[in-house]
């Protein structure tokens, strides 16, 4: 039997360490609360309301990202132009900016001292301490994930198919809806899930813009600060299970796509 190279054992050790580093805290978190504690958390109106609010606002952010991000993702996938790299860098900014800073920045333009804030206020839209503010924040942090995934899907569709469709008299919109969209939908759905998963776990920006109404991460923080680790764990487990469900769907979609290609 051939002796394993030392480099093999180094890579195996690093992989084992990283897997344990990620899994052990999650396993400890999920197994720590008792079933009665989890059931009490599920029946708790505050917990149910915060989780529903997190799911609703994250889903709304994903829908907004889909509506406004899809045309931009398609444009970036099909066109090379001066300033494209700069635009892509702007899209990536929400990923690298500290999220409390995101909340402060959004409040800066939504306040009465800014002309945009005055217009928003005159329209009867309230950002600070509102569901609208939460959705605005979650859209900001989740949008890059959707755009990148959708762009990758559009790039995988051959432009020749679109040219054939156009040569047969189809309009650009008809070509997109009948050719590009059906072929790129899987990446778009992956982007929606990634955007939702990122949004549902957001804490730093949300707590600046809207401590109330409480999303699940904010409720977890409040219970940890007020009552300690044990009281916050059941809520954290429920949120982790939702995120794992989204991750499971994401893995199924990506594996199916890999199998098709």
Regions from the language model: what does each represent?
Residues 2-36, 45-155, 183-199, 203, ...:
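Membrane-water interface segments at the C-terminal ends of transmembrane alpha-helices
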Residues 41-42:
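Surface loop/turn motifs at the tips and blade-to-blade linkers of beta-strand repeat domains
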Residues 46, 159-160, 179, 215, ...:
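An amphipathic alpha-helix/helix-turn recognition signal
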Residues 54, 130, 175, 180, ...:
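Ser/Thr-centric signal marking residues that sit
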Residues 79, 154-158, 163-184:
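Short helix-to-coil transition segments within interhelical loops
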Residues 162-163, 218, 230, 234:
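A broad detector of short, well-ordered amphipathic alpha-helices
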Residues 211-225:
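Short hydrophobic, aromatic-rich alpha-helical segments embedded in or entering the lipid bilayer
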